[in-house]
């Protein structure tokens, strides 16, 4: 993928559950004191950080993102707060803060601009290269991944990360296509091939039959589960006593990990027995918010 950072036209991400994130930080006992410091572990377009910096005039935030397009967009959005926002090129699992902070927020998964930009290859709504890398400098994209894996490993990946019951049939079809026809021309051709693995009556449902497989490939390319597991292990060490960690997830694999961590990590007090979900009003305004789940924990 050619990385042209001059094109930010697709980066118009609408942050999810902003009010709920703001409210979650009120659990921190010193939230209204001076010299607050926090980490936005998934900066994206800077939406959550923007609202936090506006509300808390003494707040300083470190914003992390591995996507250079996101960092450029966030830098523009947050320009008025440039003395209080420190944007870092980092995957959140690899970051090591120099000092402890009052809170950490994370909005997991792919964001709207990555989906909407066909050049990123995350979606089959518009044709694009089979890429799916959140960090465009990673070595392995989706195209290389499906070519490198054997049929069994590809099937296991689709089942594990996509929870797709037809994983074996889909993997067999993908490997057969690659053998007989060479590489796929793009996302639409792969999605069409996957859809052909389903009975005709299932091909035209509300959710496209390729959705779960695309999710699985995206998770694998970006090592999303491994990265989240590592992040959940280290993030309590980033917090001051009483500090807050707020995480929004968008699919069951992520949510189960966050739920388990907040429930079982002895360093944390789980503040959400059940996840907080978006309001009906927000879902009406932003359909992509509907699957969001917010969980909150506090350092003991």
Swiss-Prot record:
One of its GO terms (cellular component) is cytoplasm. Transmembrane segments: none annotated. It is an enzyme of class 2 (transferase). It catalyses: cytidine(1402) in 16S rRNA + S-adenosyl-L-methionine = N(4)-methylcytidine(1402) in 16S rRNA + S-adenosyl-L-homocysteine + H(+). S-adenosyl-L-methionine binds at residues 46-48, 65, 92, 107, 114. It is found in: Cytoplasm. Its EC number is 2.1.1.199. InterPro entries: RsmH, SAM-dep_MeTrfase_MraW_recog, SAM-dependent_MTases_sf. GO terms for molecular function: rRNA (cytosine-N4-)-methyltransferase activity. HAMAP family: 16SrRNA_methyltr_H (MF_01007). This is Ribosomal RNA small subunit methyltransferase H. It comes from Prochlorococcus marinus (strain AS9601). The lineage of its organism: Bacteria, Bacillati, Cyanobacteriota, Cyanophyceae, Synechococcales. The gene is rsmH.
């Amino acid at each position: 993928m050619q990385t042209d950072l001059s094109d930010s036209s697709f980066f118009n991400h609408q942050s999810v559950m902003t009010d709920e994130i703001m409210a979650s930080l009120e659990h921190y006992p010193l939230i209204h004191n001076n010299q607050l410091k926090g980490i936005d572990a998934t900066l994206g377009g800077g939406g959550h950080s923007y609202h936090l910096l506006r509300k808390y005039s003494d707040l300083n935030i470190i914003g992390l993102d591995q996507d250079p397009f996101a960092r450029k967009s966030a830098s523009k959005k947050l320009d008025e707060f440039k003395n209080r926002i420190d944007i870092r090129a980092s995957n959140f699992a690899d970051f090591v803060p120099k000092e402890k902070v009052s809170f950490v927020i994370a909005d997991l998964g792919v964001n709207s601009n990555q989906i909407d930009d066909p050049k990123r290859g995350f979606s089959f709504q518009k044709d694009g290269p089979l890429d799916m890398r959140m960090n465009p400098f990673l070595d392995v994209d989706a195209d290389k991944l499906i070519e490198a894996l054997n049929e069994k490993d590809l099937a296991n990946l689709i089942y594990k990360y996509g929870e797709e019951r037809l994983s074996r049939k889909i993997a067999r079809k993908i490997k057969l296509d690659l053998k007989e026809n060479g590489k796929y021309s793009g996302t639409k051709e792969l999605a069409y091939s996957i859809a052909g693995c389903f009975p005709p009556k299932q091909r035209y449902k509300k959710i496209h039959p390729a959705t779960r497989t695309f999710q699985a490939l995206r998770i694998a390319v970006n090592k999303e589960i491994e990265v989240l597991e590592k992040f959940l292990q280290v993030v309590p060490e980033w917090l001051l006593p009483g500090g807050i960690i707020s995480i929004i997830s968008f699919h069951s694999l992520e949510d189960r990990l966050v739920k388990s961590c907040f429930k079982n990590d002895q360093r944390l007090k789980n503040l959400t027995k059940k996840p907080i979900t978006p309001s009906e009003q927000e879902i009406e305004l932003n359909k992509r918010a509907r699957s969001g789940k917010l969980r909150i924990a506090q350092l003991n």
